[in-house]
Amino acid sequence: MKSSNPSLTTCIRLNEADFYARFDSPHIVGPQGKPPPLHQVAIERVTICCEITCISDLLRIVDEHPVAENVEYNINMKALHRISEPLRKLDAMIGMESLKEHVVDQIIYFMQDLHVKADATPNTKADAKAENGVFNDYMHTVIYGPPGTGKTEVAQLIGAIFSRMGVLKKTKFKKVTRSDLIAGYLGQTAIKTADVIKECLGGVLFIDEAYALGNADKRDSFSKECIDTLCEALSDHKSNLMVIVAGYEKDLNDCFFNANPGLNSRFTWRYNIDNYTPEQLAKIYEKKVLDCGWTLKDPLRLDWFQNHADYFTCYGRDMETLLARAKIAHSRRIFGSSDDKKRQMTHADLERGLTMFISNDEVKRRKEPGVLTTMYL
């Protein structure tokens, strides 16, 4: 999308003190490696005026406006360039249009330091130990979606973005499930959960299938101990911990958020990953084939994925399993053939791979009427 307001560029002159403070840098040097005389360098002030509606808009700014020591922007261009790599990876993920649109709000909010108290000094902003003396807002995030839709990868990319922006001080990303947080005896669960939280300070704690921590009737004492410990940490470490939870929306609401009334308000940022269409599944399968260095001898048929979509309820995860089975089918078909026949996937390989894929009893049941895809009734 092109901006309705073009970028505005003006040149300014800095006073001598500001000049040498800004340009104590190897990028702009004069004789003997010193900054050039003040009168020789004009500082260009560039104002970026455009509407940001999606990740692509941010990437366009990066592509059109390089970071330079003699250019001053009205936005944090250095931070935007630092996060461009994870932004491109997120933008390149198949589907997820709603998430890609709305995650921009979270990024530009924190990039502008709007989460920081107005009276915070530069030193307290940079101090990872400042804790709640600085931050007004939570980073904690929810990603709704079924298995196999890329929630873990999205969580990793969001964590990388916050780390590169400097909001998080570490690149730490730890994925956990119920067994990593809940112990076998009462009293031990709080300690185990607290230890995991401590390990993740400065980075991201990602709880996959977080609904498994609780239950709808709230009778699990171990779960309550874990969730209460987690809920307290969400506030105590607001400034240096991002917790991301993921799972089915209904299950998370019934079994996780319903377990403690304080949880809901601490997870400000929420995103939905929609179910993949047959066309998107075909694109995911093709990408996985190419990413592993194989080729498609026969073009993929959209109608084939439409006809078998009911088997692929775990979406991207199923495409990975299907490819593994198709590779096995391929190895049998080309046994004894010349090297130029290898790693060229045919439709016959895909068909045989599907036969192997649906031989699993759990996969067979996916086409049966009334089969539930969630863990809880």
What are these regions (language model features)?
Residues 1-81, 86, 91, 98, ...:
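N-terminal accessory segments that target, anchor, or regulate ATP-driven/P-loop NTPase machines
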Residues 126-171, 195-198:
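Walker A/P-loop
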Residues 127, 332-377:
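C-terminal engagement/docking regions of AAA+ P-loop ATPases
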Residues 165-170, 255-258, 264-265, 270-313, ...:
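Conserved C-terminal "switch" segment of AAA+ ATPases
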Residues 170-200:
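Short glycine-rich substrate-engagement loop in P-loop NTPases that contacts/grips substrate
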